[in-house]
């Protein structure tokens, strides 16, 4: 019981709400900060609440609506999430509806809403703009207990999952000035939280935050091997008959991993945005009902999963930001039992993520997302406590060691030179890369091809003419992973750029030298002037992980 709740235990309202909590939900006690949020909403106050996954966000808007006996409107981004909530409420004997693109007879549902048939009205952000008049009438005729905006981080341009549709729902204060707004999220930094308050015009700019710590989650990071089966199958075998989610970066990778698991006689479902709604619904339902234990998915299988006994979450590929990663591992251990989160990465993953980011033409978006990606890179490469890195990212103070992550438990203590970061001067190698690319005109090669050339690979894709290139084999003393890091840093610093070219059915990613890169090499050739060149084209020492 937190201090706020302790100060209210003798009030009549507190006793009524505790009785409601027990009668409807079967719980004896509120979770941290729950009562404070509920009480403020009942008082008509706006609230921005940041509660970790499994902290009971739904009760924060359900209990006020039941207590006030007025309908609540909930903005939710996923149809699957709405349906999950509707089914849960149905089991509790509480009426609710989901107004979204799947509804065939919207006119009838609007009529039912105005006849007060539903206590909870779930609406997608895309659909709510068409319900303005109905919402105003509902407030005039019966009153609305609150407007709840779930996954509120989607409204902030500073957040990891900004969605344009959420920007269209900022009208509530104009049409319902006296109805409290409850903005809810499990993943928001202080900057994002304040932006949520500003955009929604809340009468508060200070969020109510509970701890982000999920002490029952074990955190471990590993580098990918050349064979995904060697990485994933042993983990699945370590936790037999347990519910497992495996996240992949792309739809193609999702299918590939699912096929590999099938070959190894591992039964799994697959879920990504390219599949039919029928297929996705079946996978989702079968997983929730334990008909399948393992799902391989993209992040499309994220917010809509309300399964308490997920025991393992595997990220096969570096996530693009810490907020998304935190939300996805939050699918694990919602029952409070110990659960295990593994992340596999290589530096090609970061190049893939940069490519995704570059496909958005908004420079502010690119800048924000690239900064978030760098934070994720630090998480997977640093040797300090993983939990400490996560919690400090969310502006939460914590102890130096959690004793429940790979770094604290000494998992890597016998591994030489893996994931040890150091600042390295790679000017000569950077110059080698740029000169190699410039020496092969009219060629559209990706990072891996240039690395193969530098390392003197015997790959058949390297033509005899290129094998005669003076740079062929000059980088053989360094590993492919090491070279990938150098390429990644050169792209990050603007000396190279990754360009998408459509040469056939599918686009390919090729590497080009930028004007900044050409200028830098020209100056680097002057040798003695290298340390005195203009800072705008200076190559900084880079933080490297791979040592050879």
Curated annotation (Swiss-Prot):
Residues 38-206 form the Helicase ATP-binding domain. Pfam families: DEAD, Helicase_C, RecQ_Zn_bind, RQC. GO terms for biological process: DNA replication; double-strand break repair via homologous recombination. Its EC number is 3.6.4.13. The keyword rRNA processing does not apply. Keywords: ATP-binding, Helicase, Hydrolase, Nucleotide-binding. The keyword Hydrolase applies. It comes from the Viruses. It catalyses: ATP + H2O = ADP + phosphate + H(+). GO terms for molecular function: 3'-5' DNA helicase activity; ATP binding; ATP hydrolysis activity; four-way junction helicase activity; nucleic acid binding; RNA helicase activity. This is Putative ATP-dependent RNA helicase R290. It comes from Acanthamoeba polyphaga mimivirus (APMV). The lineage of its organism: Viruses, Varidnaviria, Bamfordvirae, Nucleocytoviricota, Megaviricetes.
């Amino acid at each position: 019981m937190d201090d706020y709740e302790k100060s209210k235990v003798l009030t009549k309202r507190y006793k009524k709400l505790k009785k409601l909590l027990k009668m409807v939900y079967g719980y004896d006690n509120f979770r941290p900060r729950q009562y404070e949020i509920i009480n403020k909403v009942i008082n008509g106050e706006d609230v921005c609440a940041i509660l970790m996954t499994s902290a009971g966000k739904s009760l924060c808007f359900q209990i006020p609506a039941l207590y006030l006996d007025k309908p609540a409107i909930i903005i939710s981004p996923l149809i699957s999430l709405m349906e999950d909530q509707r089914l849960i409420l149905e089991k509790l004997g509480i009426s609710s509806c989901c107004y979204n693109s799947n509804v065939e007879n919207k006119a009838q549902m609007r009529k039912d809403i105005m006849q007060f048939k539903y206590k909870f009205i779930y609406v997608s952000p895309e659909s709510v703009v068409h319900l303005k008049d109905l919402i105003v009438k509902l407030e005039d005729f019966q009153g609305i207990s609150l407007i709840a905006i779930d996954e509120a981080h989607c409204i902030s341009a500073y957040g990891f999952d900004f969605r344009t549709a959420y920007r269209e729902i900022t009208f509530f204060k104009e049409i319902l000035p006296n109805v409290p707004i409850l903005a809810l999220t499990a993943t928001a930094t202080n900057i994002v939280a304040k932006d949520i308050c500003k955009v929604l015009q809340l009468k508060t700019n200070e969020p109510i935050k509970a701890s982000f710590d999920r002490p029952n989650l074990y955190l471990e990071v590993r580098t990918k091997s050349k064979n995904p089966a060697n990485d994933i199958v042993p983990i699945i075998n370590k936790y037999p008959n347990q519910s497992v989610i495996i996240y992949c970066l792309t739809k193609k990778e999702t299918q590939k991993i699912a096929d590999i698991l099938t070959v190894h006689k591992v039964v799994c479902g697959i879920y990504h945005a390219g599949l039919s709604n029928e297929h996705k619904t079946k996978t989702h339902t079968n997983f929730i009902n334990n008909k399948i234990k393992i799902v391989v998915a993209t992040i499309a299988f994220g917010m809509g999963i309300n399964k308490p006994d997920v025991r393992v979450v595997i990220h096969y590929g570096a996530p693009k930001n810490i907020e998304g990663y935190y939300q996805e591992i939050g699918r694990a251990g919602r029952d409070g039992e110990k659960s295990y989160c593994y992340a596999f990465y290589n530096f090609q993953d970061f190049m893939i993520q940069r490519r995704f980011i570059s496909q958005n033409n908004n420079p502010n978006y690119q800048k924000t997302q690239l900064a978030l990606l760098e934070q994720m890179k630090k998480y997977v490469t640093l040797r300090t406590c993983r939990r400490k890195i996560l919690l400090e990212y969310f502006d939460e103070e914590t102890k130096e060691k959690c004793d429940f992550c790979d770094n604290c438990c000494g998992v890597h203590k016998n591994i030489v030179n893996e994931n040890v970061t150091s600042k390295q001067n790679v000017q000569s190698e950077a110059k080698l890369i740029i000169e190699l690319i410039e020496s092969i005109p009219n060629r559209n090669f990706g990072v891996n091809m240039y690395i193969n050339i530098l390392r003197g690979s015997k790959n058949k894709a390297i033509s005899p003419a290129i094998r005669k290139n003076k740079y062929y084999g000059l980088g053989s003393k360094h590993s492919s992973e090491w070279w990938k890091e150098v390429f990644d840093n050169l792209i990050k610093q603007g000396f190279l750029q990754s360009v998408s070219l459509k040469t056939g059915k599918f686009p390919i990613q090729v590497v080009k030298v930028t004007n900044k890169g050409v200028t830098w090499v020209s100056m680097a050739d002057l040798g003695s002037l290298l340390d005195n060149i203009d800072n705008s084209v200076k190559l900084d020492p880079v933080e490297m992980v791979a040592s050879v």
